[in-house]
Amino acid sequence: DRSRGLGDVYKRQASDPDADRIGIAVRNDKGEFVLVNGNQIVMIFLNYLMTRNKELGLLKGNEYIVKTIVTTETIKTIAERNGFKMYDCYTGFKWIANVMRENEGKKNYIGGGEESYGFLCEDFVRDKDAVSACVILAEIAAWAKDQGLSLYQLLQKIYVEYGFSKEKGISVVKKGKSGAEEI
């Protein structure tokens, strides 16, 4: 394993070529790299953004987050327990952007994402953005390390606090005009 020579590195992150999705591998408690799925990434991001904004006293009482209907319901639990409004919208970042547009000037956007490894962490961007997400992820890793946690341990802590979930992804392909009509 070439990663053994990287010393203290306990996470790897990358984006796809058009920089709109982020992937993460973290070391588990055995020191092995494991992939973090899209739902887990959104949980880590949104939990951090809500928690950190509270810690820094940046909340005005009108904050909200957005997830899509295909994204884990654990996000709803995290939002409710932290006193944040959560919007659940159709799949796709255009729908997250629509929620942002509807709340512009009225509420404070904290973050949004979906299980497809996309995340939107700034209100001045209206599509998934891996560049900003990579920066926030580095910030999350440093914040976790300050607490004596790896990202893997942070994820486990989130599960313990908000509940474990099981998921299974299914991909269905529909072809042609009849397929489009079925969708």
Q: In which residue ranges do the predicted regions lie?
A:
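Short glycine-rich anion-binding loops that position phosphate/pyrophosphate groups of nucleotides
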Residues: 16-20, 116-118
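Glycine-rich phosphate-binding loops that contact phosphosugars or nucleotide phosphates
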Residues: 8, 17, 78
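Single conserved hydrophobic/aromatic residue that forms the stacking wall/gate
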Residues: 1-10
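Short Gly/Thr/Asp-enriched flexible loops that form oxyanion-binding sites at enzyme active sites
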Residues: 20-38, 75
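Catalytic or ion-translocation cores adjacent to nucleophile or general acid/base/metal-coordination motifs
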Residues: 37-50
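Phosphate-binding and adjacent anionic-ligand microenvironments
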Residues: 32, 52, 57-183
